[in-house]
Regions:
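Cyclophilin-like peptidyl-prolyl cis-trans isomerases
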Residues: 1-167
Length: 167
């Protein structure tokens, strides 16, 4: 199962680990299918570490808070799996503010990040050479002192490939 995030810097194809983390996969795929991520900015970028996205493009609290929400309306529990680790470039993981605070935001690592193992739910990884090129372009974006990209970088749209949740 995979999705392609079409960004203004190129495509990121992500293999989603549906069987290992079913609730996280369901949330991510449903948000993708509902166009939730269309226009979502890459709002935090730390070269050598990660890039974060997944907040709504047009937040309007309380239904769609700036920090994002899950398909269930609030946060949901972690699905930490010892076999799923932040062990290579392109691993995709849920962003959170502590245990059980997953919503819609996620990040992609630029390198190994073992200090995140056990803290953030890994739910996918980038696949293909084009994804690696796009990650390199993302990592090269200049940032300000608060790790915000100085240029606009967004998810323009998402393509779902063989969605097992489709009815």
């Amino acid at each position: 199962m995979s999705v392609t995030l079409h960004t203004n810097l190129g495509d990121l194809k992500i293999e989603v680990f549906c069987e290992s983390v079913p609730k996280t996969a369901e949330n991510f795929l449903a948000l993708c299918a509902s166009n939730y991520y269309d226009g979502s900015p890459f709002h935090r970028l730390i070269p050598g570490f990660m890039v974060q996205t997944g907040q709504p493009a047009n937040p309007s609290p309380p239904e769609n808070p700036k920090g994002g929400r899950s398909i269930w309306g609030g946060n949901f529990e972690d699905e930490i799996r010892p076999a799923l680790r932040h062990n290579e470039r392109g691993v995709v993981s849920m962003a959170n503010k502590g245990p059980g605070t997953n919503g819609s935001q996620f990040f992609l690592v630029f390198d190994k990040a073992p200090h995140l193992d056990g803290l953030n739910t890994v739910f996918g990884k980038t696949i293909g050479d084009e994804s690696l090129r796009t990650l390199a372009k993302l990592e090269a974006v200049e940032v300000d002192k608060k790790n915000r990209p100085k240029e606009k970088v967004v998810i323009e749209r998402v393509t779902i490939h063989a969605n097992p949740l489709a009815e």
